[in-house]
Amino acid sequence: AGIGRDTRVVFYGAPMQFGVYAWWTFRYCGHKNVALLDGGRKRWRAEGRPLVTDEPAEHAAVAYAPAARDESMRILRDEVLQAVRRGGSVILDGRSPEEYSGKRVGGPGGPDVGAVRAGRIPGARHLHYAELLDADERFKSRDELRALFQAHGAAPDAEIITYCRMSHRATVLHFALTQLLGHGKVKVYDGSWTEWGNLVGVPVER
């Protein structure tokens, strides 16, 4: 793709969480010069900006030396279990109400598959990722976001874990907290419910 270590990369997706997940993955892998197109193609098109349909030209291959991963952005299964047992962390579930309540394991509108068990990580607070967005999939204002997170106990100094089903929606919460509100202790559990709901012996709340 012609991307080097210093190339600026702008992501968008449809739905928007796929663009955010790509942003998060690049940042986690040490590529810092990345950005997110707020509102994505939906907003771009609504504003009358140009679109193309032709196939882009191929870019010459470039060397890419991997950087150190930023492990401060990610939390693993055993660490989540420790956080549940220890208490004190704010765990935010970005899934739909149906998934959070245990009525489904899959997202609305799709197959109800992906995990053996339904429910949520014990103590998790429900904050559907879509609550952070306007109708055109732009992030709400910082004041609105701050109020939403504070209502769910996510104070600026809190240790926060975000998760969903496959971690795409969880990265939307992470982006809002870290990039728009400046929170410094936020980690994505990227195993999310696809891992937790298939594990043997971990606690599940419904």
PLM ranges: what are they?
Residues 184-206:
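Extended hydrophobic/aromatic segments used for targeting, binding, or gating
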Residues 1-86, 103-104, 119, 169-192:
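Thiolate-centered catalytic microenvironments shared by cysteine-dependent enzyme domains
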Residues 1-6, 81-152, 156, 202-206:
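Positively charged, proline/Ser/Thr-rich regional signature most characteristic
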Residues 131-134, 168-170, 194:
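Short Gly/Pro-enriched loop/turn and capping motifs at secondary-structure junctions
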Residues 10, 90-92, 161:
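Conserved beta-strand elements of the Class I
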Residues 164:
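Short cysteine clusters
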